[in-house]
Amino acid sequence: MLNNRRIAVVLPAYNAAKTLRRTIEDFPPGIVDDIILTDDASRDNTVEVSQELGLATIRHLENRGYGGNQKTCYTAALERGADIVVMVHPDYQYTPKLITAMASMIAYDEFDFVLASRILCGSALKGGMPLYKYVSNRALTFAQNVLIEQKISEYHTGYRAWSREVLERLPLRACSDDFVFDNEMVVQAIQFGFRVGEISCPTKYFQEASSINFTRSVTYGLGVLETAIMFRLKRLGLAEPGFLDDDPGKRLAGPDFKAPPQKAPVAAMAALAGVAVVGAWLGIRLLRAAFRG
């Protein structure tokens, strides 16, 4: 507990049996009030290890995806009375030793959510991040900052902390169940005016650490750009993306929500229009930035 605010850590897990114990051992003592692990139909003994460690354990019988797993994590944390929720990946890629610092930034009302950036300290490549991922990370972050008009050093970290107010307010049910969930959630928080903070975070890539392959990375990158473009189109009054709709029914605390499928021709036309309008605008901004540099 910090400043009389209850701290919960959520662990969205998939095949994390080999690294879970090491992750928990690095938790700072005396700070975390609740630890919740949601297992997304792992093929190993993640659930058994979690139960041995005494963690509150939730098991998906079918894989719901990375975003779907987080929805379960945050819902459980809210139901169990958390005031601040820190998401830590149980693959030991991010150090849990920053939990106190991240939670403090929210507990003392400096920020509403905090991102742990691997870029601020320049440790990404030193920690083993593949070069193509580093380059794409920087390119995507630059494009996102231009489109969203922010100065965030990294949108793609999996290490985050959120206030209860943010989690109760965002329409998270409307977000993707896949990896782009992370970006949609950040964009939602910016859209609704919440304060974002960052903290420098080392990272490490190793055999047991989870990482998406090249094909899924490309899919993720396209999803990230689409998310930022739709944000810009909404600000320009040219689109009303569902994940940015301020609908109480799409919140985790709201009634069950299932997004209606969008017809393919309509989605395609919206995407083409978005690329045309925002592409021209982004090109101008990039040229201006190049001439300034």
Language model features: what each stretch is:
Residues M1-N3, E149, A174-G293:
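Hydrophobic helical membrane-anchoring modules
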Residues A8-P12, I36, R59:
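Short hydrophobic beta-strand elements that form part
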Residues Y14-P29:
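Short, well-formed alpha-helical segments that are part of the catalytic scaffolds
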Residues A16-T19, S42, T95:
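Donor nucleotide-sugar binding loop of glycosyltransferases
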Residues D39-V47:
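A conserved acidic beta->alpha catalytic loop
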Residues A41, G65, Q93:
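A short, conserved beta-strand element in the Rossmann-like catalytic core
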Residues E62-E79, P96-F179, F206-T215, L225:
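Acceptor/aglycone-binding surface of glycosyltransferases and processive sugar-polymer synthases
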Residues A82-Q93:
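Short beta-strand-to-loop acidic/aromatic patch adjacent to the donor-nucleotide binding site
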